[in-house]
Amino acid sequence: MPTAYVVLLVSNLIFATGYSVSRIVLEDIGPATLAMARLAIGSLILVPWAWRGMVAAKLSREDHWRLALTGVVGFTLAFALGNWGLAHSTASNAALLITVEPASLILLSPLLLGERLSRREGLGAALAILGAAVIVVNGIPGVTQALVPHWRGDVILILSGVAYAAYSLIARPVLLRHPALVVTAYSILWGAVAMLPLAVLEWATGPPPVWTPRAVVGTLYLGVVMTALGYAVWNWCLERVETPRVAIFLNIQPLGGALLGVWWLGERLTAFTVAGGLLILAGLHLTVKARRRG
């Protein structure tokens, strides 16, 4: 197996732990505060590490705009929406709904990269969207039950998955011209700058964060391992592996994340949640198979 594939496998297994860790930390601190802490820690690690490359990089005006956009979309929006959604949903649902990201990669690639969408890919994306809807509704309205209490959180998590997909697509052209470490450092720095107003607003209007030992340890893990190292490795893989193939490995996250939510947090998976997850995986398999044939 190529080295990049092994790295993708391991990195997605690590990313799968983030849902349960974040769910625990969010019991003590607010969503924007956690996102700000992750981005601040990531910036403090990556910027000094990548400083020589950042100074030496000959970035065009388009590169600067893309890096700013990747920071705002892929870090500020994705992190904030992910945390807010997770605070009002479950770690298991968050893990399953991340499969919206690869489907979004297929849907957004024609818009952002000029790639054509085949009928099979469109059908696969539709199945993935249907699966996400089944998870959000968790049944048939009027037949089984009304929308579950955390449906709003699930919808926000879907938007977070779309933001993550947009990040990968926006960043890829820059990654083909500049080192992954430089792109990651710039992006996270922009994300931290854009997140600061949201964090300040949360501090001013909400309860103060409670920095319990588990909140500190969890935040450090999310900042160092998941953000700084995780995204540096992720961008390294994006340099070497085509986006549709990267999407295949994202399937590891819902399985690992959902199992951790059940085992670690005692969450329950309903039949509709499992069915929705299977629909998403079936849709993703269809789109990837179509892309391979194309």
Predicted features by range, described:
Residues 1-36, 143-173, 193-197:
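Glycine-/small-residue-enriched transmembrane alpha-helix faces in small-molecule transporters
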Residues 6, 18, 41-45, 97-111, ...:
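Alpha-helical transmembrane segments of compact multi-pass small-molecule transporters, enriched
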Residues 12-16, 70-79, 102, 136, ...:
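Transmembrane alpha-helical core positions of polytopic small-molecule transporters
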Residues 14, 18-19, 47-98, 108, ...:
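Specific transmembrane alpha-helical segments of multi-pass solute transporters/efflux pumps
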Residues 25, 34, 38, 85, ...:
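Hydrophobic/aromatic residues within transmembrane alpha-helices
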Residues 28-77, 104, 108, 162-170, ...:
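Transmembrane alpha-helices of multi-pass small-molecule transport proteins
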Residues 35-37, 91-102, 170-193, 223-263:
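Helix-helix packing/entry segments at the starts of transmembrane helices
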Residues 59-66, 95-98, 114-134, 138, ...:
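Loop-to-transmembrane alpha-helix entry segments
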